[in-house]
Amino acid sequence: MKIIALLLMVFLDFIIVNXAEQNEKKRRDNLGIPGAGDTEDANQAYKIAQDLQYKNSDSSPGKRSIMLSKLKNNAKRQFSEN
C-alpha cells in the first residue's frame, strides 16, 4: 500500500512540475521573453535590440553615409585579406 502511494505521489509530482514548466513557457511567450533554448526567439530579440539601438542613435543622413562608407571599407579590407 505504501509503495502504491509513493508511486502515485511521484507520478503526481511529475505531472505538477511538467505543467508548471509549460505554464512558465506560455507566460514567457505571451510576454515576448525568449525562453531557455529558444534560439529563434533569442535571435529575434537580438535583432529588435539592434534596431532599437540604431533608431536611438544619431541617424542623420550625413552620419549614415559616413557609417556606410566605413562599413564598405571594412568589408573591402576583409575581403582583400581573405
From Swiss-Prot:
This protein's record includes keyword Signal: yes
Major localization listed first in the record, in broad terms: secreted
Family: Belongs to the scoloptoxin-21 family.
Keyword tags: Secreted, Signal, Toxin
Subcellular location(s) per record: Secreted
Lineage: superkingdom: Eukaryota
Signal peptide: 1-21
A single cellular component GO annotation: extracellular region
GO molecular function: toxin activity
Tissue spec: Expressed by the venom gland.
Organism listed in the record: Scolopendra morsitans (Tanzanian blue ringleg centipede)
Protein's name in the database: U-scoloptoxin(21)-Sm3a
